[in-house]
């Protein structure tokens, strides 16, 4: 064996060991946070950062990835999963405020944070603007989970999810346009920047659209869940790489293909079981990638450097909070003046305080070129902001929602659903008892007693509880109708999809059928 071959094998072995360490530690910590009642109170992402810091403190470095690889590995799955899960039908109703917050909001964040850091911390303007672009990307995953737990209104959830999805893409484009300025590889020009921005966006949307619709129609031709699941993974990474090669924004391409496959392809080309399989697959992928990213940021931090940059971190946090408030309340007012659906000041406050920073900002910070002076300052400033948003904003979010009176009726709806389920179960029990044939092993008296007991429980206890709930919470009366309506939409959409796959219905659907296929799950 040659020396080169031996060195190559040793490098592969070392990289594999590093990967297995990262895999074991990240999933181990994430799992611990779910099974322990004490750790369950702490966001698992925060636990991962703490473990990463601990490993860095004892000088155990987990893995060394090039900045380019960090973006190519971590961004596509995070963005695709977010785009796959957002429902276009809901997003379309709030598209204007979402786009306003995502595009103009990113510009305000980049300029506001950049000039604030330049003025108050002495950071050079190109580096400060780069920090602003990195921190323009919001990542409210834990806040959205809290929304669903507390029953916060659907519109507020869509606004926050939609803003996060689109501003991630815009922030990454802004980052790619600004990162060359401090390196001296490009000069800033408003005209050239706008042209480049439109070009990146256009190529990204075009590539994502072609690949998304192509895979959507391809999956109509077969019913192989694992192949369809694999195609979504290939589409996420493939779209990113192809779009980047063509000179566009891979991030915008991934967001586009995710929206198309999640809202169109999953309807016309996948049966319900496959859709569930793919959704669960991407839920795991996002969980896994988030785990690794938050572990790596802790691993990359220099403890002494973090303490030395305390003033820079504090200035960055203050600038971020103030600029975010200006952006949300200002753009919210503009949106209210133009659209008919007002965003209340309570909702604006939640959007402001819930704009956490997370995986995308961390991935961008870690992807800053190594040769750039001030790279470590950027990483530590971003880490400080992410830590603040997780610890302070994330942990106080429930209190803010409660004080603003935005908690919905989720708990009552859950109890009401359980009562309906109990009633259905008792009805099935009665139907089964009525169908029991005479048998020597079953005493008729016992059977009759059991029937009467079940019937009495159904007619008195369950009926009284449901009536009481209906009187106490009138808004719950439509719950059964909502569930039935959603069920009929699912059955109807699945029937059309089956007919299309069987060749009994034309691919070119009428607007009516397209609307049915676009109904949310």
From Swiss-Prot:
**Which terms in the GO cellular component ontology are assigned?**
plasma membrane
- Topological type in the membrane: Multi-pass membrane protein
Report a single Gene Ontology molecular function: sodium:proton antiporter activity
Lineage, top-rank taxon, reads Bacteria
Q: Does the keyword Transmembrane apply?
A: yes
Query: Which residue ranges run through the membrane?
Result: 19-39, 42-62, 95-115, 127-147, 165-185, 195-215, 246-266, 277-297, 312-332, 350-370, 381-401
- Which residue ranges are assigned to the Cytoplasmic compartment in the record's topology? 40-41, 116-126, 186-194, 267-276, 333-349, 402-521
**Which protein, by its recorded name, is this?**
Na(+)/H(+) antiporter ApNhaP
The organism that produces this protein has a lineage beginning with: Bacteria, Bacillati, Cyanobacteriota, Cyanophyceae, Oscillatoriophycideae
Q: Which gene encodes it?
A: apnhaP
């Amino acid at each position: 064996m040659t020396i080169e071959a031996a060195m190559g094998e040793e490098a592969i072995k070392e990289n594999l060991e590093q990967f297995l360490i990262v895999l074991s530690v990240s999933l181990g910590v994430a799992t611990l946070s779910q099974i322990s009642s004490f750790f369950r109170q702490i966001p698992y992402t925060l636990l991962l950062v703490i473990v990463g810091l601990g490993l860095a403190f004892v000088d155990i470095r987990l893995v060394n990835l090039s900045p380019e690889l960090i973006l190519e590995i971590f961004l596509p799955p995070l963005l695709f999963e977010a785009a796959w899960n957002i429902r276009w039908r809901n997003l379309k109703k709030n598209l204007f405020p979402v786009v306003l917050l995502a595009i103009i909001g990113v510009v305000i964040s980049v300029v506001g944070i950049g000039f604030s850091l330049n003025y108050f911390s002495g950071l050079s303007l190109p580096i400060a603007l780069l920090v602003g672009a990195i921190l323009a990307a919001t990542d409210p995953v834990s806040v959205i989970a809290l929304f669903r737990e507390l029953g916060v209104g659907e519109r507020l959830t869509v606004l926050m999810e939609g803003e996060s999805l689109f501003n991630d893409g815009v922030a990454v484009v802004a980052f790619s346009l600004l990162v060359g300025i401090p390196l001296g590889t490009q000069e800033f020009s408003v005209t050239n920047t706008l042209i480049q921005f439109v070009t990146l966006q256009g190529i990204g949307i075009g590539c994502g659209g072609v690949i998304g619709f192509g895979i959507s129609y391809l999956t109509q031709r077969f019913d192989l869940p694992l192949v369809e699941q694999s195609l979504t993974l290939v589409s996420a990474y493939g779209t990113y790489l192809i779009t980047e090669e063509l000179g566009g924004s891979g991030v915008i391409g991934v967001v586009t293909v995710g929206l198309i496959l999640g809202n169109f392809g999953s309807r016309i080309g996948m049966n319900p079981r496959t859709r569930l399989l793919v959704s669960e697959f991407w839920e795991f992928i996002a969980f896994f990638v988030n785990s690794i990213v938050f572990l790596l940021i802790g691993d990359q931090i220099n403890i002494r450097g973090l303490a030395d940059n305390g003033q820079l971190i504090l200035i960055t946090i203050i600038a971020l909070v103030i600029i975010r408030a200006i952006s949300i309340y200002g753009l919210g007012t503009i949106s209210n003046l133009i659209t008919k659906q007002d965003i209340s000041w309570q909702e604006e406050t939640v959007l402001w305080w819930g704009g956490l920073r997370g995986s995308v900002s961390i991935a961008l910070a870690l992807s800053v070129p190594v040769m750039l002076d001030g790279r470590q300052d950027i990483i530590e400033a971003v880490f400080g902001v992410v830590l603040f948003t997780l610890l302070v904003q994330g942990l106080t979010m429930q209190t803010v929602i409660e004080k603003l009176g935005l908690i919905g009726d989720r708990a009552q709806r859950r109890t009401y659903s359980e009562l309906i389920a109990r009633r259905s179960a008792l009805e099935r029990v009665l139907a089964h008892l009525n169908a029991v044939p005479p048998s020597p092993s079953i005493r008729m008296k016992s059977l009759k007693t059991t029937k009467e007991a079940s019937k009495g429980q159904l007619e008195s206890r369950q009926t009284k509880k449901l009536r009481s709930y209906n009187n106490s919470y009138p808004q719950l009366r439509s719950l059964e109708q909502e569930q039935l309506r959603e069920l009929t939409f699912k059955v109807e959409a699945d029937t059309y999809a089956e007919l299309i796959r069987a060749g009994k219905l034309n691919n070119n659907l009428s607007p009516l059928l397209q609307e049915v296929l676009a109904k949310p799950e």
